[in-house]
Amino acid sequence: MNKLNEALKKAERIVFLTGAGVSVPSGIPDYRSKNGLYAGMSSPEYMLSHTCLVREPEKFYQFVTENMYYPNAVPNVIHKKMAEIETEKDVTIITQNIDGLHEKAGSKKVVNFHGSLYHCYCQNCGMTVTAKDYLKSDIHTDCGGVIRPDVVLYEEAISESAIDQSLTAIRKADLIVIVGTSFRVSPFCNLTDYRNKKARIFAVNKERISLPYPFEMMESDAVKVFEEI
């Protein structure tokens, strides 16, 4: 049994902090790797910015619908094992991912730190719109307003409720497991600063991450690690 398995068995309150590497095995590309979403693209950050949404809504809509949605993607073993652990322990998942796969796997306590592509709303009247309808048109049939997905774009702030929920879970956790993220994007990477100092921290990632305090690094493929849990 590896150290992570042992820690998961002993822990009562667990927080998983997940990034793009968790969804890559489900066929959803990450952003910055050589095969990632941004590879070979000019100004992808602009296309996913608040400025683009406001100034060029058609361009924004085309980019998002053609590059961000993977409706046929299914949860992989990482998502499934996390959901399974939640049936026995107090688990909160705080994810940078916007693909809804943790919920699809059956996880109930998920904080979508950067929002979700599957929550959409009209910017004019505020009405919630299904992602299915958004994928057909970004114009709200009821009022003519422009629909957007409820995700955090460049130039936008993380929602206060996402930060509050995350900090509450982090402070209570006796085990924090960072999975599939380089853990460099702020404020996500600052969440562990608010941990209970007795909490153990593990990181499972193909590349080593750095933290300014002790943690246990598993430089490995997360799929292999979670298959053994």
Swiss-Prot record:
Gene that encodes the chain: cobB
Keyword list, A-Z: Cytoplasm, NAD, Transferase
Location, primary (coarse class): cytoplasm
EC number, as in UniProt: 2.3.1.286
Domain Deacetylase sirtuin-type: 1-229
Cystine pairings recorded for this chain: none
Source organism of this protein record: Listeria monocytogenes serovar 1/2a (strain ATCC BAA-679 / EGD-e)
Protein name, UniProt field: NAD-dependent protein deacetylase
Catalytic activity: N(6)-acetyl-L-lysyl-[protein] + NAD(+) + H2O = 2''-O-acetyl-ADP-D-ribose + nicotinamide + L-lysyl-[protein]
HAMAP family documented for this protein: Sirtuin_ClassU
Record-stated family: Belongs to the sirtuin family. Class U subfamily.
